[in-house]
Regions:
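Hydrophobic ligand-binding cavity/cleft-lining segments
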Residues: 1-50
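Beta-strand elements of well-folded, non-transmembrane domains
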Residues: 12-14, 61-63, 92, 118-120
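A conserved amphipathic terminal alpha-helix motif
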Residues: 117-160
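Beta-strand/loop substructures that line and gate deep hydrophobic ligand-binding cavities in soluble
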Residues: 85-133
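Glycine-rich portal/gate segments that line the openings of hydrophobic small-molecule binding cavities
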Residues: 30-31, 40-89
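Hydrophobic/aromatic beta-strand elements that line small-molecule binding cavities or substrate pockets
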Residues: 8-10, 69-76, 88-89, 97-104
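Intrinsic-disorder/low-complexity, polar/charged segments enriched in Ser/Thr/Lys/Arg/Asp/Glu/Gln
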Residues: 3-11, 54, 69, 81-83, ...
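A short, structured loop/turn motif at beta-sheet edges
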Residues: 13-17, 75-82, 101-111
């Protein structure tokens, strides 16, 4: 079966920069995935994702069912465009390409988009169905989390 692409978008009640800073944080990843997926390599981690880094470890469904060893490579983190791209794989999943895009709507609101392209061979359809549920729940959690986000005063290095 060919790869499938799923796109989900939601508007968040928080400034784009605050949401973007949270996207770059493993803490937000843990918050929006809690109860659905557990990924021990990010438990307790407080430093931001780094472009080019790979995080690998066992993925747990609903926090209790061991799935497979999952690999996440942070392929690109573009702070100016507020875009994060990860290339992931593990178990039945040959490729899980995930883009997160944050776009300002005004000074107090932003648009958050998850776009994922999944190739899991014969299992692409059921894996994509799971992804639909996963991102629906994650975005509902982003909507609850967004109004609680605080501004960060982190200075980010700019390449060049």
């Amino acid at each position: 079966m060919d790869a499938r692409t799923l796109t989900r978008t939601t508007d968040l009640d928080a400034p784009a920069q605050q949401v973007w800073d949270a996207v770059c944080s493993p803490a937000a990843f843990r918050t929006v995935a809690r109860g659905l997926l557990r990924y021990p390599p990010v438990v307790g981690r407080t430093d931001a994702w780094e472009p080019g880094e790979t995080v690998s470890g066992r993925l747990w469904l609903f926090g209790v069912l061991p799935l497979h060893r999952h690999h996440i490579r942070l392929a690109r983190i573009d702070h100016d465009q507020m875009t994060l791209t990860s290339d992931e794989h593990g178990g039945l999943v040959r490729s899980w390409g995930h883009d997160i895009v944050v776009e300002p709507l005004d000074e107090r609101r932003c648009r958050y988009t998850d776009r994922v392209t999944i190739d899991a061979g014969w299992a692409t359809l059921p894996v994509t169905c799971f992804a639909r549920l996963l991102y629906r729940v994650r975005q509902a959690r982003w909507r609850r989390l967004a109004p609680t986000l605080q501004p960060t005063h982190r200075i980010r290095p700019h390449p060049g």
